Amino acid sequence: MSTPPSSLIFTVSRLNKTVRELLEGEMGQIWLTGEISNFSQPASGHWYFTLKDDRAQVRCAMFRNTNRRTTFAPRNGQQVLVRASLTLYEPRGDYQLIAESMQPAGDGLLQQQFEQLKQQLSDEGLFSQQFKQPLPSPARRVGVITSASGAALHDILQVLQRRDPSLPVVIYPTAVQGQEAPAQILRALEAANRRAECDVLIVGRGGGSLEDLASFNDERVARAIFASRLPVVSAVGHETDVTIADFVADLRAPTPSAAAELVSRNQLELLRQLQSQQQRLEMAMDYFLAQRQQRYSRLQHRLQQQHPQLRLARQHTALMTLRRRLDDGVQGQLRQAQRRHDYVRQRMVQQAPAARINRAQQRLQALRYQLSQGISLRVNRQNNAFVALCSRLEGMSPLKTLARGFSVTTDSHGAVVKQTRQLSAGDRLTTRLRDGWVESQVTEITRQPARRPRRSQD
């Protein structure tokens, strides 16, 4: 085997140097995307990390004077886009990248843009509660801005059909993903506000990645939602998905189905409420009627208690009680006199003097006659007084007056009508006659002028 010339034989150091020069000279600066791993930041301030994909990895370094210009904090697992120079570390023969700049890539970039726009709009006050419009209750017509072929529209219509089938729905079809989506959503919002045919709007779509939801993180869409004269309910993605549209909308719904729930009335619940109100009204009416019935019964009882016949009956009962007490008093006096008579007679019989007995008998007869005369006289007086009282009472009875051809007229309040100034045309009157009542209505009132005193003639 022949030996090559010494000029063609590489030492290790020469090889590594040659490779480094080739890499740096031929490759120059490149753009590289990958996932950060093994990230470290020692006290020197330099960054050391590895970029990898599913099949390979490469070491990277970013020096302190360069990484201080980076606008985010790198972390393991983050996708980044790096502008770097390729070089080789000669002592070990390891090649690596020297990063000159770094920015998030994929969802990382979108997340950074999301946070920046969120902070900007928040600083401008677009998220403030003072600008939130209340939702109409109930909504007369609902507008839906979403894809005409998406699952979100199907879910919204299904919920509205179940809860409130009579609620009209206007669909403003638009793309919800892709480069044209923000402009189409913008035009749909403008059309809905210009036509003003709805009183609330649902803006949304189904779930997806951060890139899929990018249209609802667009600044133009956010400002259009904020400027909408119609209340807007955002319904983007699933409950865990959060977009800029959620912050500027008047109300955020976690899902499209939930948005439909928020803007619609539950007819079954309304029916239950109506039935409950009807039941309460019926109970109130029953209570009111019961109160009125009790009041009527009390008034009727009081009226019956004041009836003239009842008053006469009570007075007659009182007179009979007095007469019975009078009779009892007379009988008591008679019994007492009889007992005294028997006692005296017994003593006289015991003493048996005939003369005294005769005188006593005569005196007794005289006393008995006087007592009988006195009792008769007193009974006659009491009876005459009773008859006189009955006659006076009967003469004062309103029924007696009615029997003589007179009548009593009362107004609708039960007050006795005595003068024409108590009445007005149209008043209802009740006239009591001897054998019944007459209901009438005042049609004309004629007042008799007062008579003037006659002047004396000189």
From Swiss-Prot:
GO molecular function: exodeoxyribonuclease VII activity; nucleic acid binding
Cellular compartments annotated: Cytoplasm
UniProt keyword annotations, A-Z: Cytoplasm, Exonuclease, Hydrolase, Nuclease
Claim: ATP-binding is one of the keywords in the record: no
Catalytic activity, as annotated: Exonucleolytic cleavage in either 5'- to 3'- or 3'- to 5'-direction to yield nucleoside 5'-phosphates
Chain coiled-coil ranges: none
Assembly mode: Heterooligomer composed of large and small subunits.
Family membership noted in the UniProt record: Belongs to the XseA family.
Known function: Bidirectionally degrades single-stranded DNA into large acid-insoluble oligonucleotides, which are then degraded further into small acid-soluble oligonucleotides.
HAMAP family the record matches: Exonuc_7_L
Name the UniProt record assigns to this protein: Exodeoxyribonuclease 7 large subunit
Organism: Sodalis glossinidius (strain morsitans)
Gene that produces this protein: xseA
